[in-house]
């Protein structure tokens, strides 16, 4: 008999995720520590369900209400994802209904993250303090006069002025004059794997419209082009703030919509506010279930 896995699909500004609830410790190790090939299969938009990543809601290991484990579409483990944690928050609120607590302490590989469901349905997330130390990001770029890692990345004959910020995961910010007329995919995939980032990096091409309005195009580590990146929007504001190019709060325009990002006083936590919405619920067919997730009791079991 095969284990039938229930899942839900959610999106935040078009950044979409498959969510599986394992808070009762009911998931097998083949789901909790999955084969990357299985994650790639279910995230495939032609042969699977299709998503930018997989999120597992798991029992806490420390003082959190639960633990989030997130995998990129290529099967690699991610430290944190801003749009993903908003989707998880909306998922939890939908499950709990009228008993919804409105606030959760969620354990991630980037530390405890605290999202709050607001009355208007938007989700405000305390994303924690940005990492500006090169070793913590990690990057080999060195600290510049603005107090964050800066430098040049060379792509053949092209030299790009860049900055780096960590939000529990690495981000490379590349200011450009025109977002539409850059070799986006070529630069994105090359910068993701640039030698200045030993753990690879998320890449954000940034245009500054005003001190209170930024626009970015996103190339996510392990996923490629996506419609939005919450941690990337936070990192972009931190970088422009320190470089004197923006205020400590701004709306960030992404292909999938708008996030409100603030870094009060340019110290402490960065806050991200934005939406997340359900798309559908489903059950994985046997062909999409983990290869070892076979057999439990006498009947097919939905968990």
Swiss-Prot record:
One of its GO terms (biological process) is lysine biosynthetic process via diaminopimelate. The record marks 171, 220 as: Could be important to modulate the pK values of the two catalytic cysteine residues. It comes from the Bacteria. It catalyses: (2S,6S)-2,6-diaminopimelate = meso-2,6-diaminopimelate. The active site is at residues 81, 229. It is found in: Cytoplasm. Its EC number is 5.1.1.7. It holds the Pfam family DAP_epimerase. GO terms for molecular function: diaminopimelate epimerase activity. Coiled coil: none annotated. Substrate binds at residues 15, 72, 82-83, 169, 202, 220-221, 230-231. Pathway: Amino-acid biosynthesis; L-lysine biosynthesis via DAP pathway; DL-2,6-diaminopimelate from LL-2,6-diaminopimelate: step 1/1. Keywords: Amino-acid biosynthesis, Cytoplasm, Isomerase, Lysine biosynthesis. GO terms for cellular component: cytosol. The keyword Zinc does not apply. HAMAP family: DAP_epimerase. PANTHER family: DIAMINOPIMELATE EPIMERASE, DIAMINOPIMELATE EPIMERASE, CHLOROPLASTIC. Homodimer. Belongs to the diaminopimelate epimerase family. Catalyzes the stereoinversion of LL-2,6-diaminopimelate (L,L-DAP) to meso-diaminopimelate (meso-DAP), a precursor of L-lysine and an essential component of the bacterial peptidoglycan. This is Diaminopimelate epimerase. It comes from Prochlorococcus marinus (strain MIT 9313). The gene is dapF.
């Amino acid at each position: 008999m095969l284990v039938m896995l229930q899942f839900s699909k959610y999106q935040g500004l078009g950044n979409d995720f498959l969510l599986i609830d394992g808070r009762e410790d009911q998931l097998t190790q083949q789901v909790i520590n999955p084969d990357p090939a299985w994650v790639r299969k279910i995230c495939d938009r032609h042969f699977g369900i299709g998503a930018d990543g997989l999120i597992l809601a798991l029992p806490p290991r420390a003082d959190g209400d639960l633990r989030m484990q997130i995998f990129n579409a290529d099967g690699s483990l991610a430290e944190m994802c801003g749009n993903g944690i908003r989707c998880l928050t909306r998922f939890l609120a939908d499950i709990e209904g009228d008993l919804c607590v409105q606030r959760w302490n969620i354990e991630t590989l980037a530390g405890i993250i605290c999202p709050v469901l607001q009355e208007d349905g938007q989700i405000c997330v305390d994303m924690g303090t940005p990492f500006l130390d090169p070793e913590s990001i990690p990057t080999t770029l060195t600290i510049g006069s603005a107090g964050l890692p800066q430098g040049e990345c060379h792509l053949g004959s092209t030299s790009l002025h860049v900055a780096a910020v960590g939000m529990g995961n690495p981000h490379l910010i590349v200011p450009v004059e025109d977002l539409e007329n850059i070799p986006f995919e070529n630069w994105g995939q090359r910068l993701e794997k640039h030698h200045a980032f030993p753990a690879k990096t998320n890449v954000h091409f940034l245009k500054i419209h005003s001190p209170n309005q930024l626009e970015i195009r996103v190339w996510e580590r392990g996923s490629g082009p996506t419609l939005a990146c919450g941690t990337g929007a936070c990192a972009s504001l931190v970088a422009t703030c320190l470089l004197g190019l923006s205020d400590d709060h701004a709306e960030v325009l992404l292909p999938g919509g708008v996030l409100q990002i603030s870094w009060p006083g340019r110290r402490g936590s960065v806050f991200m506010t934005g939406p997340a919405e359900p798309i559908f619920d489903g059950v994985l067919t046997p062909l999409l279930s983990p290869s070892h997730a076979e057999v439990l009791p006498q009947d097919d079991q939905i968990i």
